Amino acid sequence: MAKDIKFSEEARRSMLRGVDTLANAVKVTLGPKGRNVVLEKKFGSPLITNDGVTIAKEIELEDAFENMGAKLVAEVASKTNDVAGDGTTTATVLAQAMIREGLKNVTAGANPMGLRKGIEKAVVAAVEELKTISKPIEGKSSIAQVAAISAADEEVGQLIAEAMERVGNDGVITLEESKGFTTELDVVEGMQFDRGYASPYMITDSDKMEAVLDNPYILITDKKISNIQEILPVLEQVVQQGKPLLIIAEDVEGEALATLVVNKLRGTFNVVAVKAPGFGDRRKAMLEDIAILTGGEVITEELGRDLKSATVESLGRAGKVVVTKENTTVVEGVGSTEQIEARIGQIRAQLEETTSEFDREKLQERLAKLVGGVAVIKVGAATETELKERKLRIEDALNSTRAAVEEGIVAGGGTSLMNVYTKVASIVAEGDEATGINIVLRALEEPVRQIAINAGLEGSVVVERLKGEKVGVGFNAATGEWVNMLETGIVDPAKVTRSALQNAASVAAMFLTTEAVVADKPEPNAPAMPDMGGMGMGGMGGMM
């Protein structure tokens, strides 16, 4: 396919049009008075959102060169979302400002490589200063403030703070769509996995259709049990102890299952069998997790153990086990704290090394189950459109809160970027490098300016006043007052602000050093079918 090539100024100008188109659509959502953007969906109702990355991903431009510019800025939003989970609109606004200012200087004859050096120096200084001024997040109320600012909803802030308090900072918090109008929190304590009882005859509570075992022994194996003789020795030992038994195996079937059910119904002993969770290597890892949590052993031929050799000592123990049709929850496992801590350390090390998003999610789940539980926020709304929008906001708030716990908080509303202004301005540089630093200085003002504009105010007036205020004091666009942002609870996670700045600078530097752009030439439209004129049936009469 033939290619279309543009060089230097012409190339950068074409791409800038794409940058502006995307950024202008995204930046209207910034701040407490930001507006929403409606996205058309081919099926179902349109999506109404104020989430920068969701809007950026939807934008596709007809002109290939403009589209490349738009995709570059979409990359800034996407990367910031991957690293920090929020701050995508701020990143887009910063990238647009740096690209715009940089292009003015390149057009005026500045050397792009010199500008790039200056931009990189300025960002390093800004990030260092952000680390200095960030404050660690402490207590439930601080967590609630971060979440409430991100979601623009105090109720959501309280829910997320409560969820994090209940399951800990490493706990898994998931979002589900609720059937009702209200948003609720549901916390599952202990280790839960998605496997239910092998037979409904094993239930102990017919009203709730669940089996509850108090202080049970837990037999953990990766084998299939089809012959009762295999587990008879250990079964007899458990019956002598007068305790219930939970069997976690690859499968329990045939004669073995029938014998267990008959004895359960006769009241000889209380036993529940469930299938082992997961598949393949993940199943082995999860069984090992359960064994460590309950102080038992995984009975597997890989370790030279068979079921006949199992004793009460090789079984796990727990305070309580609840088994429903679909889930099994093990509460208060009696495993040793040292072994559990070692296992947690092992999973954390794997988390740092993995590059797969799926593996990371599964490792995070395993970690949460060992640490203390899973919280589910059930999102409710009156309509499907509102539900989708609300779910996106809560997702952002959740990511924002996790980022705050990791690296602390800074003054919100773009104030922290203005607080590092003096440090960046003090960098000694000359020529194009100094111009690069000035480009970043101009960009640091942009989020505050845009928040003010979205609130219907004159952005430049707010920016100039902010330069004269002391660190931490900023403009609350929601009320129109000048306040101490940290004390008022208007805060941003330092990680979100840092990621937005670094990703914006990275793409802006690449953009300014672009000298040629290559795109596919649009294919000419196929000619329309020629008009058949008088070739109707009547005109063909002579051919009959």
Curated annotation (Swiss-Prot):
It is found in: Cytoplasm. The keyword ATP-binding applies. ATP binds at T29, L30, G31, P32, D86, G87, T88, T89, T90, G413, N476, A477, A478, D492. GO terms for cellular component: cytoplasm. InterPro entries: Chaperonin_Cpn60_CS, Cpn60/GroEL, Cpn60/GroEL/TCP-1, GroEL-like_apical_dom_sf, GROEL-like_equatorial_sf, TCP-1-like_intermed_sf. It catalyses: ATP + H2O + a folded polypeptide = ADP + phosphate + an unfolded polypeptide. GO terms for molecular function: ATP binding; ATP-dependent protein folding chaperone; isomerase activity; unfolded protein binding. Keywords: ATP-binding, Chaperone, Cytoplasm, Isomerase, Nucleotide-binding. The keyword Magnesium does not apply. It is an enzyme of class 5 (isomerase). GO terms for biological process: protein refolding. Gene3D superfamilies: GroEL, GroEL-like equatorial domain, TCP-1-like chaperonin intermediate domain. Signal peptide: none annotated. PROSITE patterns: CHAPERONINS_CPN60. Its EC number is 5.6.1.7. Together with its co-chaperonin GroES, plays an essential role in assisting protein folding. The GroEL-GroES system forms a nano-cage that allows encapsulation of the non-native substrate proteins and provides a physical environment optimized to promote and accelerate protein folding. Forms a cylinder of 14 subunits composed of two heptameric rings stacked back-to-back. Interacts with the co-chaperonin GroES. PANTHER family: 60 KDA HEAT SHOCK PROTEIN, MITOCHONDRIAL (PTHR45633). NCBIfam families: GroEL, PRK00013.1, PRK12849.1, PRK12850.1, PRK12851.1. Belongs to the chaperonin (HSP60) family. This is Chaperonin GroEL. It comes from Bacillus anthracis.
